[in-house]
Amino acid sequence: MQIDSIDFQILQLLNKNARIQWKEIGEKIHMTGQAVGNRIKKMEDNGIIKAYSIVVDELKMGFSFTAFVFFFMNAYMHDDLLKFIATRNEISEAHRVSGDACYLLKVTVHSQEVLNHLLNDLLKYGNYQLYLSIKEVKKHYNTSLMSDE
């Protein structure tokens, strides 16, 4: 599906505030709320809009430990590892990477004990290097793709 300039404007507004009412979007781009809703539904159906979400403050939620784990596979057990990753809520992000490591995992946990348990469970798939975050200095949600600048 190709998006046109109107769809792009709708996406920009949703990107700034996913809770915005269709009617309000329509007022800003000179369409009816129903027409906006139809366009949003079409973008959802075509996978342009995948989900709506919230951003929470991990520290305020009690996730006081953030770690980055470079993971090195022992063998070709990638499918098993990917299944394991999918079941673990402590792993907030997982990326297949180039270089010496196979994967980069971002882990957020309440305690060192939970982190240690996860790391012990990972050992059946390979080895890791652990980097603890001391302080988050920047967190950016990439909205530049939606910028008209």
From Swiss-Prot:
Cited Pfam families: AsnC_trans_reg, HTH_AsnC-type
A Gene Ontology biological process term: response to amino acid
InterPro entries: AsnC-type_HTH_dom, Dimeric_a/b-barrel, Tscrpt_reg_AsnC-like, Tscrpt_reg_AsnC/Lrp_C, WH-like_DNA-bd_sf, WH_DNA-bd_sf
Annotated DNA-binding residue span(s): 22-41
Entry-linked Gene3D superfamilies: 3.30.70.920, Winged helix-like DNA-binding domain superfamily/Winged helix DNA-binding domain
Record PROSITE patterns: HTH_ASNC_2
Domain of life, source organism: Bacteria
Name recorded for this polypeptide: HTH-type transcriptional regulator LrpB
